[in-house]
Amino acid sequence: WIEKRFREFLESKMFKGLGTERMVKGSDPHSPISQIAKKVHDQFVFIMSLNKTFIIKKERLKTAFNFLLPVKTFEELKIPLQVTATDIQTGEIQVYSSGDLLEAVVRSSSIPGYVEPTFQDNKIIVDGGVGLPNPVSILKPLVDFTIAVDVKRKIVPDLADLNIFEILQRSELVGYTKLLDNLLKEADIIIKPDIMNDHWSHFNLFDKFLTNGISAANEQLPDIISKLSKSNSWSNRFKRWFDQKTL
């Protein structure tokens, strides 16, 4: 159902209205934030002249997720879900696990500088990946076993045309990559699909991304089964129970 629905979405006017094909041209950046930096940079003067804080309205993203999500509240889900977002006023991580699922997912996907942020009380809420690129730490106390998926792009030596913008962008990339690597260490299993170092918005490569993701997961199956078996042992269960009680 998920794959079929997503393919329908890629052919819809809703998808075209998001403008993802215009995000990155030429030299693609790598991390979730720097991936959008090129787009923001190209329109910087225009945005500043209008005193704007985003390129596309939040409602466009909400319309897209309204089509993609089969349910609209956390309570309707068969498997519990934690959704994260970031308050860029304080840097605090916002975790949503009940109530309006659609609103939570939209907040978690609001790329700063591209999608309109959510203003609530004194908070300015944007993409969860800003403060927590991979939310293993959120799930660790709640589950017995964690599987993370690493789809970050590699740092490649492409700083031939050195300038201030490239230096700032590469500095952000290095910091993001190091943070993500440390976060991933908390996972029991890490699945690393071959994304061919392509930008995540290259939806024309959906079939390759899907195939490579399935392949990477299948390669990890023996390790997953082995570690799950050990994880379910009485001693490990007792240790996890004790750790949770002492948090």
What do the predicted segments below correspond to?
Residues 1-247:
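Patatin-like phospholipase
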